[in-house]
Amino acid sequence: MMKRTLLLMVMTLSALTGFAQSEQKTWSYGSHTYTQQGTLTAKQYDKRAKGVVTFTNIPSDYEEFEALYTQFLGKTPHGTAAMMVMAMEIYGRDREVGKQCIELINYPSNVNSVISRLKDKFGTSAYAPENDSYSQRYLPAAVLKGATPQNGYRPQQPYTVEMKASVNKHQELQISGSGRVVYLYVMGKGWDTEQRTVEVLRQPNQPLYKIFNCPALYTQCKTIQGTWQGLK
């Protein structure tokens, strides 16, 4: 009995290690509130590292998005990965503003592939029609906690993006300059494979991370059941 109790204690401590020595930080812009917590970093690889970002709203414009990136979320790999979800949603609302947001947080070589794919997937309508299996305007919601195809991709609030370390260790960039690529999983119920790989780059002497590659965030997800109600 004692052995079982000790084993359960070890398992619990192991599960909590991903957030060890990590405090939740909060940042506000007007009435919008953002938080982040996690131990994911480019400094060293930790297979138990995790990250979580919450937000009450999608940034209203480029100015808010830029401030959020430069002052808060862009300073961590998980914060930057979560901002890719926001940028995708902004692109769905306004192509030009969304393009600016995508260019801001992405490494240059990744920009065109993201925009090309989103333009194709989002089509011209503001919201996806019922049971649309291709023009998936709801893609940004597919990685938000609580959102599933069955509930019309309606996430819990505040919106939450959960992440954890990939099985792939950090890699030094050998082409297109220098830096270290952090591989992480963004969790989402929109696919059979719920671990969506995102590559985030940290370059020397640069305070902010950049999205290096992220096709798993905009590949075909499960078809919505019902009509998507959008995000606020």
What are these regions (language model features)?
Residues 13, 86-93, 187-191:
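Short, flexible beta-strand-to-coil junctions
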Residues 5-14:
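Sec-dependent N-terminal signal peptides
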Residues 35-143:
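Core segments of small alpha/beta cavity-forming domains
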Residues 21-29:
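Cleaved targeting-peptide boundary
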Residues 116-189:
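Surface-exposed, charged secondary-structure patches
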Residues 1-2:
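N-terminal secretory signal peptides that target proteins for export/translocation
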Residues 16-20:
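Sec/Tat signal peptide C-region and signal peptidase I cleavage site
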Residues 183-185, 190-231:
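Short beta-strand edge/turn micro-motifs at domain boundaries
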